[in-house]
């Protein structure tokens, strides 16, 4: 079968059969236009005469060896059909094809020998089931198509092609005119022979204005394309050297404009697809064919413009880059000649060596080796390469780290204690533990080997304590938060192969602080992100916080071991439950339980008030906040364990006072002179001066202000003498009575609901994230009846607390059977147990003994003793087990004026460790059996 070259290959050359001509003047308009476009002239006549001959010239007596002139084109009514898969053959152009079928090739050679060297070239139709873009698919289709199958797959309209030459399997075809298949002649499959009709253009008026206008538009568009595309200019030169001779011949014989040739030429040299070219080939209306060609050529103009703009932009970019590179090299060469600055590579190398030379003996050997290798590599790289920037950044990080540079630690315990007391009030147990740590460091000469974790509610000063430890030890301080951190690269850095890669937080820390032994505060470690596609940050923290591993900590970016064993790590967390076990095991946890009321009072008076007053620009003599106001603020507005909310409320008070002071100052200013007064006379100035004088003037003429600020708040006026001038200072008094004017209505009410708890009601103690609180347990009857005993529980209780209520019900029934067997309350009564504050979720086992006491109080119809509170987990046998939050619960009891507290015996040690001011005034009983609680709660005199 046939194997065809690609359209690019066969479109790069084209010829048409040419005719001889005499020395006739050039009058054809088409020839004139093409001559202007290509620069062709009559001197090309000899070249055209030697290259081509015409089969239409009746005066021609001989022909060249390429084209036989004996047969006439109109006599070719039966031809061999050759399928063209990629593009139709346009008249006036030639196409090389490969014929592999021996039968077809022999038939073509036989046609040439019989001096009838013509065949029909027909475009192959697309097959929807095959990939038209695949050459191998096309070859397979051509091999399978035979006879009727082939004629059904080719277009009816094709081109009469002259067989110009046959060399091996290559056949050169030259297009002449359009053909239409009428019927198939050969019955055999190969070669396919068909009968054809020669198609002629429809008659047209050569003087028609519309056709002329279209013709000129095509010529104008061709001129635009030829200005931008050299390939098209080559096409036109070749075409005019052949086609123009034919046009002169036509002028001599018929004397008409050859518009069809222009349409064929434009379609043939355009980059149109095969369907568009086939449409031009099949169109016999000359005007419509010119319009189709005009559309194709205009598309080519647009494509060429886009290509030209892209090429121009690329050229400008590269020329600009080349210019900058050349100028940069020239500048470097000039600097070298002048003996000034060296090139960038030398300057960078000198900078890096200047960093490491003074500390070369302190840099570890493996790190120094890497630095030397990278410096050698830097000299071999081009400054314009991306690897150069990567190497520079890497060397910059390696050489800027504080190799061998340590802060001189201060292990003076007295100085550290003073600093801790200056920064924080209370927290004596925490301070004691920190001082122990510093003392051990002083004896050992270093404070390495410990990872401290400060655990406690928000606002208790965990972060500020870490900063105080750094100040006490004279270490540099660095803080970073890991809350929500899910990317391991934030801790261990990115690989250098990534764009924008950076080291991890620890390497950045060492660079920022400039020492190898800073104090690093890792905040919110209990909120560390979970494992994801970026790795497991908790596992990465293990290497960082393990004293046995962080001596050789490997950052992904630096890729060299770094010694972090001298770094003191302090972590903070609100709770330790969410910290992974292996990570928590490497820490020494110090619990900050929060501040009691007395501690908050001191903090508010000695720290927060002074800071807020200074930040608001208020003098001490302008505001006086009473202790009662601070106490009310703590108990009714800020019950959390920390002091952060207390600080906000104090700042709110001072901001409102600052606003009042500014408004007062603005209202007492002397009004300015009206804008409509343009000039001041001496009389006016004298009157103004007189008006400004005070009614009361000292002997020396100094003014004494006596006006007082008229506000609704209690104020007092004090006079201060400064030299000879007396000023009136207004002082705002803030006490419990007017506190709500500054901070709004109280948020919390009194926890103590009853002066004397009624029957069935007992006060318990609970722990919350805001500290401790009191908790009432209430029990009452629902209905009585034989065998209707039961218990209904409400109060938004958790599963553990519901189980505690069931246990309490069982234990209470057992105790009543022992104490009063005749009492059938639990057997015949349905009871309802409720825990107030139903919107607040509650859970935990520590209210077990309180629930038993509430049930027994109802059964005995006897209230418990006044000012009693209790807490403790109870078992079915009546044993009292340990609970948590002893300090917080004790503080809550004091806040509710409780005098007697019952704790489990197992918590005696926890209570003994409390500060004296926390335990003062409390009667505390420690029990391990409920029988002891029964005696304390009900064994009293009415």
Curated annotation (Swiss-Prot):
Homohexamer or homoheptamer. Organized in a ring with a central cavity. The modification Phosphoserine is found at residue 54. Residues 673-725 are annotated as: Disordered. It comes from the Eukaryota. Residues 79-301 form the Lon N-terminal domain. GO terms for molecular function: ATP binding; ATP hydrolysis activity; ATP-dependent peptidase activity; sequence-specific DNA binding; serine-type endopeptidase activity. Its EC number is 3.4.21.53. The keyword DNA-binding applies. The gene is LON4. Belongs to the peptidase S16 family. ATP-dependent serine protease that mediates the selective degradation of misfolded, unassembled or oxidatively damaged polypeptides as well as certain short-lived regulatory proteins in the mitochondrial matrix. May also have a chaperone function in the assembly of inner membrane protein complexes. Participates in the regulation of mitochondrial gene expression and in the maintenance of the integrity of the mitochondrial genome. Binds to mitochondrial DNA in a site-specific manner. GO terms for cellular component: chloroplast; chloroplast thylakoid membrane; mitochondrial matrix; mitochondrion. Residues 682-692 have a biased composition (Basic and acidic residues). Its main location: mitochondrion. This is Lon protease homolog 4, chloroplastic/mitochondrial. It is a peripheral membrane protein. The active site is at residues 846, 889.
């Amino acid at each position: 079968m046939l194997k065809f070259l690609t359209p690019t290959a066969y479109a790069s050359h084209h010829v048409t059969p040419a005719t001889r001509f005499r020395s006739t003047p050039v009058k054809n308009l088409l020839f004139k236009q093409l001559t202007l476009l290509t620069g062709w002239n009559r001197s090309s006549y000899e070249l055209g005469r030697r290259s081509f001959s015409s089969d239409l010239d009746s005066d021609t007596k001989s022909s060249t060896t390429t084209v036989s002139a004996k047969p006439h084109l109109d006599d070719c009514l039966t031809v061999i059909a050759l399928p063209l898969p990629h593009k139709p053959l346009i008249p006036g152009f030639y196409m090389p094809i490969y014929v592999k079928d021996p039968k077809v090739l022999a038939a073509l050679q036989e046609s040439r020998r019989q001096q009838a060297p013509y065949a029909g070239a027909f475009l192959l139709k697309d097959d929807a089931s095959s990939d038209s873009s695949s050459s191998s698919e096309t070859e397979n289709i051509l091999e399978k198509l035979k006879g009727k199958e082939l004629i059904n797959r080719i277009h009816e309209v094709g081109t009469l092609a002259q067989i110009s030459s046959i060399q091996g399997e290559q056949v050169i075809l030259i297009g002449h005119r359009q053909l239409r298949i009428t019927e198939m002649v050969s019955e055999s499959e190969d070669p396919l022979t068909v009968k054809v009709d020669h198609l002629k253009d429809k008659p047209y008026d050569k003087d028609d204005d519309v056709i002329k206008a279209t013709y000129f538009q095509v010529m104008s568009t061709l001129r635009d394309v030829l200005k931008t595309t050299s390939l098209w200019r080559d096409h036109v030169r070749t075409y005019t050297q052949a086609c123009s001779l034919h046009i002169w011949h036509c002028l001599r014989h018929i004397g008409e404009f050859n518009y069809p040739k222009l349409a064929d030429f434009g379609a043939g040299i355009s980059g149109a697809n095969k369907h568009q070219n086939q449409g031009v080939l099949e169109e016999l209306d000359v005007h419509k064919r010119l319009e189709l060609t005009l559309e194709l050529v205009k598309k080519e103009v647009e494509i060429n413009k886009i290509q030209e703009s892209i090429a121009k932009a690329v050229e400008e970019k590269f020329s600009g880059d080349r210019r900058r590179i050349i100028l940069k090299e020239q500048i470097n060469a000039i600097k070298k000649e002048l003996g000034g600055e060296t090139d960038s590579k030398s300057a960078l190398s000198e900078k890096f060596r200047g960093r490491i030379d003074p500390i070369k003996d302190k840099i570890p050997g493996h790190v120094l080796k890497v630095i030397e290798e990278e410096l050698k590599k830097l000299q071999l790289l081009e400054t314009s390469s991306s690897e150069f920037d990567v190497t520079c950044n890497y060397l910059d990080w390696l050489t800027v780290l504080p190799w061998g540079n340590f802060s001189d630690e201060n292990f003076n315990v007295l100085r550290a204690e003073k600093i801790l007391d200056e920064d924080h009030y209370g927290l004596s147990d925490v301070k004691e533990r920190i001082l122990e740590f510093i003392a051990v460091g002083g004896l050992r000469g270093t404070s390495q080997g410990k990872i401290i974790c400060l655990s406690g509610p928000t606002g208790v000063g965990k972060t500020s304590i870490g900063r105080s430890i750094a100040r006490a030890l004279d270490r540099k301080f660095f803080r970073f938060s890991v809350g929500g951190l899910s990317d391991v690269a934030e801790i261990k850095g990115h690989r250098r192969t990534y764009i924008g890669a950076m080291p991890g937080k620890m390497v950045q820390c060492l660079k920022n602080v400039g020492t190898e032994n800073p104090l690093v505060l890792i905040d919110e470690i209990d909120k560390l992100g979970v494992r994801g596609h970026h790795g497991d940050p908790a596992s990465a923290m293990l290497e960082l916080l393990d004293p046995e591993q962080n001596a050789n900590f490997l950052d992904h970016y630096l890729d060299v071991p770094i010694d972090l064993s001298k770094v003191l790590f302090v972590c903070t967390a609100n709770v330790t439950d969410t910290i992974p076990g292996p990570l928590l095991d490497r820490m020494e946890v110090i619990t900050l339980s929060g501040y009691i009321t007395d501690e908050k009072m001191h903090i508010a008076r000695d720290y927060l008030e002074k800071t807020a007053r200074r930040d608001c620009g208020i003098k001490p003599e302008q505001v006086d906040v009473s202790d009662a106001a601070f106490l009310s603020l703590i108990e009714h507005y800020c019950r959390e364990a920390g002091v952060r909310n207390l600080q906000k409320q104090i700042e709110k008070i001072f901001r409102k006072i600052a606003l009042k002071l500014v408004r007062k100052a603005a209202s007492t200013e002397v009004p300015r002179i009206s804008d409509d007064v343009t000039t001041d006379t001496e009389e006016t100035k004298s009157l103004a001066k007189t008006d400004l004088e005070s009614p009361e003037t000292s002997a020396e003429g100094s003014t004494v202000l006596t006006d007082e600020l008229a506000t609704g708040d209690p104020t007092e006026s004090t006079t201060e003498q400064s030299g000879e001038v007396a000023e009136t200072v207004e002082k705002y008094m803030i006490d419990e009575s007017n506190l709500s004017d500054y901070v709004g209505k109280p948020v919390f009410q009194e926890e103590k609901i009853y002066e004397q708890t009624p029957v069935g009601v007992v006060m318990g103690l609970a722990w919350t994230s805001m500290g401790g609180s009191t908790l009432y347990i209430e029990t009452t009857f629902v209905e009585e009846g034989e065998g209707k005993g039961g218990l209904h529980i409400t109060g938004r209780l958790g599963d553990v607390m519901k189980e505690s209520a069931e246990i309490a019900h069982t234990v209470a029934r057992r105790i009543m059977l022992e104490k009063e067997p005749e009492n059938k309350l639990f057997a015949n009564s349905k009871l309802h147990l409720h825990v107030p504050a139903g919107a607040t979720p509650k859970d935990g086992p520590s209210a077990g003994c309180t629930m038993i006491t509430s049930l027994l109080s109802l059964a005995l119809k006897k209230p418990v003793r006044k000012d009693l509170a209790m807490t403790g987990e109870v078992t079915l046998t009546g044993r009292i087990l340990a609970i948590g939050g002893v300090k917080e619960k004790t503080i809550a009891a004091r806040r509710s004026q409780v005098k007697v507290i019952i704790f489990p015996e197992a918590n005696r040690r926890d209570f003994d460790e409390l500060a004296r001011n926390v335990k003062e005034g409390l009667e505390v009983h420690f029990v391990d059996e409920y029988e002891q609680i029964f005696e304390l709660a009900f064994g009293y005199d009415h």
